[in-house]
């Protein structure tokens, strides 16, 4: 019986990549040492790092003449602070769209900075059923607009990016390279890798080169220009995670790239949503035009029945379906590495469970 891991993160990883890592773990490409042991200053790692940068930009349709990828530490959570420190320079006033828990966390952290005004310019409301429209923002008032493209807990996602006159910053942690956006619309993107790209421990930042030219005297580890100058190696970078991410980027290209993953993810999500929409037992409260492709929360409406479903699903090989503690119920995370067969198995088990109730 196959096992499908629906965890929200750390999440399922591509099987071919895991197998390659297993083969190379004790002796990386004839070097006689493990990838876990190589120096971050060695030619071996520098080649891995350059490959990862090039593959990432290629998958995103971006040019190295305009954007620089960074492979950092501290998770998306550190970016909640680094973004305003580096970008809120002209007006010291920033705009945020609040569409769920993680956007609220970003707002909370930005508000801790002195001499910075943080405006919540749009919010999803208490039911978190719709992605709200973003109002027109004057370029002479705000330094940037921050959005969270996908909220894992509530299951909301932007299908279309807001058009804005100010810089656009995106937290893409949970649908990074799994949903086809025009990445050139962003001035800065960040994403924790532990959902779609690698094990936890590396955070991707892709920033326009325009914002790497001036050093504002920030502490070095919080300073994008300083980190870019040292190619993400002001301190020892997470070598293994970058190596792993490089292999996943190669795998993504072999699958057909971001557009192909978007199409597959829509197919997977569609199977689950179509069942939920006709079910008399299960429900999902998010409006169809705001639904996440990668994180689908659902519930029976009864806590004891939810727990029974989670337990019986796990026994059937469908693991980590428990919803986030803030909302309860169930949640199916269908990241890039989740095969179509996993979504089919979940839909079929939901049908079986409902028939037996």
From Swiss-Prot:
GO terms for cellular component: cytoplasm. It comes from the Bacteria. This is Phosphoserine aminotransferase. Its cofactor is pyridoxal 5'-phosphate. L-glutamate binds at residue 41. Gene3D superfamilies: Aspartate Aminotransferase, domain 1, Type I PLP-dependent aspartate aminotransferase-like (Major domain). One of its GO terms (molecular function) is O-phospho-L-serine:2-oxoglutarate aminotransferase activity. Pathway: Amino-acid biosynthesis; L-serine biosynthesis; L-serine from 3-phospho-D-glycerate: step 2/3.
